[in-house]
Structure formats: C-alpha cells, structure tokens
A protein has these predicted regions:
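An interfacial alpha-helical scaffold signature
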Residues: 1-255
Length: 255
C-alpha cells in the first residue's frame, strides 16, 4: 500500500477537512507516472492520453509503474511530481484519473479539484520586516502542524542545517511564531518559505501564521532561537550535490 492509498483511506474513514487536505498534500508530493499517447517528448512537449467521461476529459496517472502497466500494458509514460501534473492539467481544464482501476486510492479528480490544488500550491509568502522584541518557547503547537512541517521539511534535503520554531513578540505588541532556518543554502530561501506556508495550509491551519527568517549560525538571534525554540533538523544529502527543492523544475508543455 502506497502513501497515497493510506491517505485516501484515512480521508474516507475520517471524513474531516484535515484528512482530505493530507490526501492532497500526498498527491502533490507523489511521483506519478503519466500515461502518454506516444513517446514523443521533443522540446519538452508531451501528449497525455485522454479519456472523456460524462463530458470531462481526464488524463491518467499512477503512483507505481506496475499499476500503469496493469492498466494499459506497455505504453509511453512520463514521470513527474503531483504538483507539476496539477499545474499542467489545471491549465488545460483536464481532470485526473488516479490509480485506476483496483488500487485503494483509485478515483477521478475533476478539473476544479486540480485548480484548487494548483491555486493552493501557487500561493507565495509575503516578505515583510519587523523588529523582534522577545523570543520565547513556542508553547502548544497543534500536532497537525508539527506533522505537516515534518513532512514538508523532510523533503528539503540539504537546503539548511537546522531550524528553530519559537514564540515571538514584535515591537508594537504583535505576537506569533517564528521559524528560523540556520545556514541556508543561497537561493533556497523561497523554497523553504513556501514549504512552511504549505504546511500551514495542509494542516488545516491556513488562518494561522508562522513568520520565517534565515540566519547564519553566528547571528545572535540564532543562539536565542536555539535556547527557546523547538529544534527541527533538516535531512542531509547522501552525497555532495547541488540541493534542490522537490517539484520546482518547470513542467513540460502539454500538446
């Protein structure tokens, strides 16, 4: 059983918004195998095989190669992340037939569901400036948020050494939470900020807010966050490589 299977069954059994959000989070993170009409992908262009059901056209994708083979036999495929596929299909008003026919997660996702997922993933954090007055313990953090952060940052291999989640008070009286990343790879700041933003949304706490900052280990605030905050260690790459965040490469063009 795959992570998508487990997330789909949990959403069906639980029935809560949080469980459904978790399914869409797993879908965005999954590596999917898209069924193509042919093997021609020159110039970055691919042609998905489409099926029309009750007036809606669907592309078909599977989270395991064997599932695609069982459904379609030997066929041309393209492998891409769920978030990239959502972007592609939403732009063409296409739905997604996922893991048809016998998988626990088999279902049809209509174009509106993919547009919602694409809008959610396209959200960009806002950059602001504020002067910190006090750093404190983060207090009681909802388990759903901690789980979502663990899942998102678990994919950010090599993008930073560590992070600290703490309570914060700003000049002017505003209070909240801050997640400070230490020794971030240059250029990875936006990817990490988006990962935290998505963790909030997919935990069901999108009305909440976590401020994100990026520090060198020698910065005084890094030591303060280490004293008061909850430490979050990011995965270290197995071998030296240029780190990249998942799903950030440009999607191929549909034809």
């Amino acid at each position: 059983m795959t992570p998508l299977d487990r997330a789909h069954l949990a959403a069906e059994d639980d029935g809560t918004d949080t469980a459904r959000l978790t399914f869409f989070e797993r879908l965005a993170e999954a590596e999917l195998h898209l069924l193509l009409d042919d093997g021609d992908s020159r110039d970055g262009t691919i042609t998905p095989r489409l099926f029309e059901i009750e007036g809606t056209r669907y592309a078909l994708a599977f989270d395991l190669p064997d599932r695609l083979t069982d459904f379609a036999g030997a066929a041309a495929t393209a492998t891409l992340s769920g978030r990239r596929l959502a972007t592609m299909l939403a732009s063409e008003n296409l739905g997604l037939g996922l893991n048809l026919e016998d998988a626990p997660s088999a279902q049809l996702l209509d174009p509106e569901a993919l547009r919602w997922l694409n809008r959610t993933l396209a959200h960009q954090p806002e950059e602001t400036e504020a002067r910190i007055q006090e750093v404190s313990s983060p207090g009681d953090i909802p388990d759903a948020l901690l789980t979502a952060l663990d899942g998102k940052l678990g994919l950010a291999v090599g993008l930073a050494r560590t992070g600290y989640l703490a309570g914060v008070a700003y000049e002017g009286g505003a209070r909240g939470h801050i997640l400070g990343f230490v020794d971030v790879v240059p250029g990875a700041e936006g990817d990490l900020a988006r990962a935290v933003s998505e963790a909030l949304v997919f935990s069901g706490l999108d009305a909440g807010q976590i401020d994100v900052t990026f520090l060198r280990a020698a910065h005084p605030l890094a030591a303060t966050l280490a004293r008061h905050g909850l430490r979050i260690d990011l995965p270290v790459p197995d071998a030296p490589a240029t780190p990249t965040a998942p799903g950030t490469d440009a999607p191929p063009r549909l034809r």
